[in-house]
Curated annotation (Swiss-Prot):
Organism: Chromobacterium violaceum (strain ATCC 12472 / DSM 30191 / JCM 1249 / CCUG 213 / NBRC 12614 / NCIMB 9131 / NCTC 9757 / MK)
EC number: 6.1.1.15
Catalytic function, reaction form: tRNA(Pro) + L-proline + ATP = L-prolyl-tRNA(Pro) + AMP + diphosphate
Subunit text: Homodimer.
Protein name per Swiss-Prot or TrEMBL: Proline--tRNA ligase
Encoding gene per record: proS
GO molecular function: aminoacyl-tRNA deacylase activity; ATP binding; proline-tRNA ligase activity
Length: 568
C-alpha cells in the first residue's frame, strides 16, 4: 500500500474527554473517531488491525472444529423471556419495539438465539458435538461508557457456543476451546495469563479468563511465580494460616474510642498493630436477617466469596444503617461478635486469631483482648477475603504475586443452564430427550486493540506486535519526490517486500522527515526502513525497530534479507 492512496489522519493532541492512553493514541493515530458515548467509527488504519485480529481468531476457531455462523443483531424478546434474562439483564439490554409493537433487543450476547437454533436443528445425539461461532457486532447500553473501545457500548466480539451430549464431552469441548484461546493469544503476540474465574451472571461452574497484562488493567490477577496456579482476585483462595490458634493471654477489656470509625483510626488511637484488629461487615441473609462477617483489619472482604456462603443473599447485599442499629444497638465502626446473637462468619485468618481488638456494639467503644470460645461463640469459618501479595499459594508451591490485567477473553462451561430453561433437547441412544450440555466462549475483538496498546506503548505512540500491526513494515524515503535514486530504491524495496508477502507501506506523501517519522512512531509500525540520498551514496539505508532507540545502518543491497530476518 502506498500512503498517497491510503487514508492517514493523525492529530497532535487527543481530545480532552479521552480517558486512558489507548483511547488517546487510537484517536491521535486516526484509528477511531467518536460518534457518540461508547460508539466509534473504525477508520482504515484501525480497521486493518481489527481484521488481522479477526483473521487469527477465525483460523484458530476453524482449526479447533468451530463452525462459523452469523446470528442476528436484532433478537426477539420471546427468546430472552424464556430464560428470564429479558427482565434480569437490566438496562444494559437495549430494548425497542418495531412498527407492529413487537419487542426486540440488540444482542449483547447470543445464548438464547443459538440455543433456539440447536433445539430445532440438532435433534439426535448423532449430530453432536457441535461448536458454532460468530464474529459479530454487539451492543450493551453501559451506564457510563469509558476507556474508548475498552468499555464501549457497541463492540465486536467473537462468541462461540458448544453443544454436547454429556458433561464429560462438554469438558472436552471446554478444554479444546481453552487450548484454541491459548493459540490465539500466543499468535497475537501479547503477554497474557489464563486465570481461573468466577462464572458471574453467565452461570455454569467452570470458567477461565484470559487477561492481557497491563499496569492500567482493571482486574487483579493472582498467580504463583513458581507454579502454574493463576486465578482472578475474586476466586483466588486465601489459605488458612498454619498451626493452631494461640491460647488467650489477655483479659477482655472495654476501651473508650471516641470518634474512631475506621480501622486506620483505631490503630492510630490505640497504637497497635493492624494485624491485631478485626473488621466487622454486616450483610443480609436470605431471610433479610443481619449476618456479621469478620476479616482481619488489613484484609478486605471478597464479595464474590461472601455471597457464595450458604444462607447469604446472592448477589451480596449490605445491611442498611437502620438494620445495623436494630441488630447491634450501635453504628458501623463499633460492631463485633461479643454479645451478638445472630450468625457470625469469620475468615480463616480471623478464626486463628487470639486477643484481638473488635467493636463492642456500643458507639465509641471497642474491646481489646477478645477471644472466640471465651468471650463469644466460635464462628462459622469460610474463606471470605481477598488474597494479598505474599500469601501462600493454594497449591503449596510458593507465595502468591499479583499483577493487573485487562480481560479480553472468557470461557465458560454452562451445563444445562440455558438448554433446560428453553427445553432444548436431543434424543439420546435410547430415544429419550436430554438437555444439551453447553459451553460458551467469548473474545472481545475490538477490546483486544485497547489492551494491546495499554501493554505496548511509549511516549511516542503505539508499538504493535508484528502479527496485528496495521502495516508490519513502513518504507520512509526522504526526498521521494526530489531524488530519482531514493525513489528507485524505495520502489524496489517496496515491490520486493510485497513479492515476499510482507504487509508493507511505502510513505510517498512527500512529508518532511520529522513529520513522517512522528506519524509512524505514533501509529506503531514495528519495522521502519529509511532511505535517503546521503546514505545511498555510501551504499547504506537505515533500519529501526519501533522499540529501538537508534537506527542501524544496513547495506542497501542487504536490506531486504535484513528485514525478512526481523520478521521471521
Amino acid at each position: 500500500m502506498r500512503a498517497s492512496q491510503f487514508f492517514i489522519s493523525t492529530l497532535k493532541e487527543a481530545p480532552a474527554d479521552a480517558d486512558i492512553t489507548s483511547q488517546k493514541l487510537m484517536i491521535r493515530a486516526g484509528f477511531i473517531r467518536k460518534q457518540a458515548a461508547g460508539i466509534y467509527s473504525w477508520m482504515p488504519m484501525g480497521l486493518r488491525v481489527v481484521r488481522k485480529v479477526e483473521t487469527i481468531i477465525r483460523e484458530e476457531m476453524n482449526r479447533a472444529g468451530g463452525i462459523e455462523v452469523s446470528l442476528p443483531v436484532v433478537q426477539p424478546a420471546e427468546l430472552w423471556q424464556e430464560t428470564g434474562r429479558w427482565d434480569a439483564m437490566g438496562a444494559e439490554l437495549l430494548r425497542f419495539k418495531d412498527r407492529h409493537e413487537r419487542d426486540f433487543a440488540l444482542q449483547p450476547t447470543a445464548e438464547e438465539v443459538i440455543t433456539d437454533i440447536a433445539r430445532r436443528e440438532l435433534r439426535s445425539y448423532r449430530a453432536l458435538p457441535k461448536n458454532f461461532y460468530q464474529i459479530q457486532t454487539k451492543f450493551r447500553d453501559e451506564r457510563r461508557p469509558r476507556f474508548g473501545v475498552m468499555r464501549g457500548r457497541e463492540f465486536t466480539m467473537k462468541d462461540a457456543y458448544s453443544f454436547d451430549r454429556s458433561a464429560e464431552d462438554a469438558g472436552k469441548s471446554y478444554d479444546n476451546m481453552y487450548a484454541a484461546y491459548r493459540r490465539i493469544f500466543d499468535r497475537l503476540g501479547l503477554t497474557y495469563r489464563a486465570v481461573a474465574a468466577d462464572t458471574g451472571a453467565i452461570g455454569g461452574d467452570r470458567s477461565h479468563e484470559f487477561q492481557v497484562i497491563a499496569d492500567t488493567g482493571e482486574d487483579a490477577i493472582v498467580y504463583c511465580p513458581t507454579s502454574e496456579y493463576a486465578a482472578n482476585i475474586e476466586l483466588a483462595e486465601a489459605v488458612a494460616p498454619a498451626g493452631e490458634r494461640p491460647a488467650a493471654s489477655a483479659a477482655l477489656a472495654k476501651v473508650h474510642t471516641p470518634k474512631v470509625k475506621t480501622i486506620a483510626e483505631l490503630v492510630d488511637f490505640l497504637k497497635i498493630d493492624i494485624k491485631q484488629t478485626v473488621k466487622a461487615v454486616v450483610v443480609e441473609g436470605e431471610q433479610d436477617e443481619a449476618v456479621l462477617m469478620l476479616v482481619r483489619g488489613d484484609h478486605e472482604l471478597n464479595e464474590v466469596k461472601a455471597q457464595k456462603v450458604a444462607g447469604i443473599k446472592n448477589p451480596l447485599a449490605f445491611a442498611s444503617p437502620a438494620a445495623i442499629r436494630d441488630a447491634f444497638g450501635a453504628n458501623p465502626g463499633s460492631l463485633g461478635p461479643v454479645g451478638f446473637k445472630g450468625r457470625v462468619i469469620a475468615d480463616r485468618t480471623v478464626a486463628k486469631m487470639a486477643d484481638f481488638v473488635i467493636g463492642a456494639n456500643e458507639d465509641d467503644q471497642h474491646y481489646t483482648g477478645a477471644n472466640f470460645g471465651r468471650d463469644c461463640a466460635e464462628p462459622e469459618v469460610f474463606d471470605i477475603r481477598n488474597v494479598v501479595e505474599g500469601d501462600p499459594s493454594p497449591d503449596g508451591q510458593g507465595a502468591l504475586a499479583i499483577q493487573r490485567g485487562i480481560e479480553v477473553g472468557h470461557v465458560f462451561y454452562l451445563g444445562t443452564k440455558y438448554s433446560a430453561a428453553m427445553n432444548a433437547t436431543f434424543l439420546d441412544e435410547d430415544g429419550k430427550p436430554k438437555p444439551f450440555e453447553m459451553g460458551c466462549y467469548g473474545i472481545g475483538v475490538t477490546r483486544i486493540l485497547g489492551a494491546a496498546i495499554e501493554q505496548n506503548y511509549d511516549d511516542k505512540g503505539m508499538i504493535w506486535p508484528d502479527s496485528i500491526a496495521p502495516f508490519a513494515v513502513v518504507v520512509c524515503p526522504v526526498g521521494y519526490d526530489r531524488s530519482e535514486a531514493v525513489k528507485e530504491a524505495a520502489d524496489k524495496l517496496y515491490a520486493d517486500l510485497q513479492a515476499r508477502g510482507v504487509d508493507v507501506m511505502l510513505d510517498d506523501r512527500g512529508e518532511r522527515p520529522g513529520a513522517m517519522f512522528a506519524d509512524w512512531e505514533l501509529i506503531g509500525a514495528p519495522h521502519r526502513v529509511t532511505i535517503g540520498d546521503r546514505g545511498l551514496k555510501e551504499g547504506k539505508v537505515e533500519y529501526q525497530h519501533r522499540r529501538d532507540s537508534e537506527a542501524t545502518a544496513v547495506a542497501a543491497d542487504a536490506i531486504l534479507e535484513h528485514v525478512l530476518s526481523k520478521l521471521a
